[in-house]
Amino acid sequence: MSERIKQLMVKRGITIEELSRETMIDMQTLNKIIEMPDESDVTTIKLIALVLNVSIDELLDEKGGEDNAK
């Protein structure tokens, strides 16, 4: 999931600082989520998916396939 989050951030032109601000997740926590996603809670993952405008399934898809975000 960490690579997928990074891919989606690049695709949408969102920096980690912007993602932190928009999700209201502090930078330290967000970095931990991105680097060690298995330890993240569902609510946090939902917030990240919402800000990146993708479904949770798309966020968790490590293949980085085509997403439906517009």
UniProtKB/Swiss-Prot annotation:
Organism: Bacillus subtilis (strain 168)
Gene3D superfamilies cross-referenced by the UniProt entry: lambda repressor-like DNA-binding domains
One Pfam family this sequence matches: HTH_3
Domain HTH cro/C1-type: 5-59
Record-given protein name: SPbeta prophage-derived uncharacterized HTH-type transcriptional regulator YopO
GO terms, molecular function: DNA binding
Keywords associated with the record: DNA-binding, Transcription, Transcription regulation
SMART domains: HTH_XRE (SM00530)
Domain of life of the native organism: Bacteria
Ranges annotated as DNA-binding: 16-35
InterPro entries: Cro/C1-type_HTH (IPR001387), Lambda_DNA-bd_dom_sf (IPR010982)
CDD domains: HTH_XRE
The keyword Mitochondrion appears for this protein: no
